[in-house]
């Protein structure tokens, strides 16, 4: 069994360098919620050095709230903004001898695209326009995954080690109780259940079906690195290979 482990980079976390030794893919902030041209260049350089798959992490234009504000923008605006961000990172990667492999939207752009078909279509169209060989990463079972498949893109269905799930397989909003799993044992058990058995227990007790092709590891928690190391060790014991 194989699983991809991904993390978000270039968002001001001190643990970025060490996290890169534990993941197989990383998503680089492209300036709209965090980061800038210099951090993008630095992140690409480190990903190449560590043999980690390079990915873009485009967002709504929302630096003030770290890309977590809901927005209702015309699909053509989202298309242009997404193409702008991923095109910039693709060029930065190419200039350093690397290749951008995937795109994973950030924050509310990710969450809204999971449920809003028009938004999902705009993102998938931008990814396809940039490079049809790119992998589109989205919430397992979401509209974004469906849109990617409609454009013939390779998709990668994502699950979260430290997020609570609702009965329909969507994430519990960060504003609600149960959104974040802070107990390490619970997060580890949930991750193994999703990867090995394709299901997750919701906060209301029902089982939701999920297709786990990549696991998101957040690097900004107090015990994030320790958990990442433990998850890697657990996967090794279970014979689960970590690779992009």
UniProtKB/Swiss-Prot annotation:
Transmembrane segments: none annotated. Signal peptide: none annotated. One of its GO terms (biological process) is carbohydrate metabolic process. SUPFAM superfamilies: Glycoside hydrolase/deacetylase. It catalyses: 5-oxo-L-proline + ATP + 2 H2O = L-glutamate + ADP + phosphate + H(+). Keywords: ATP-binding, Hydrolase, Nucleotide-binding. It holds the Pfam family LamB_YcsF. InterPro entries: Glyco_hydro/deAcase_b/a-brl, LamB/YcsF/PxpA-like. It comes from the Bacteria. Its EC number is 3.5.2.9. The keyword Hydrolase applies. GO terms for molecular function: 5-oxoprolinase (ATP-hydrolyzing) activity; ATP binding. Belongs to the LamB/PxpA family. HAMAP family: PxpA. Forms a complex composed of PxpA, PxpB and PxpC. Catalyzes the cleavage of 5-oxoproline to form L-glutamate coupled to the hydrolysis of ATP to ADP and inorganic phosphate. This is 5-oxoprolinase subunit A. It comes from Shigella flexneri serotype 5b (strain 8401). The lineage of its organism: Bacteria, Pseudomonadati, Pseudomonadota, Gammaproteobacteria, Enterobacterales.
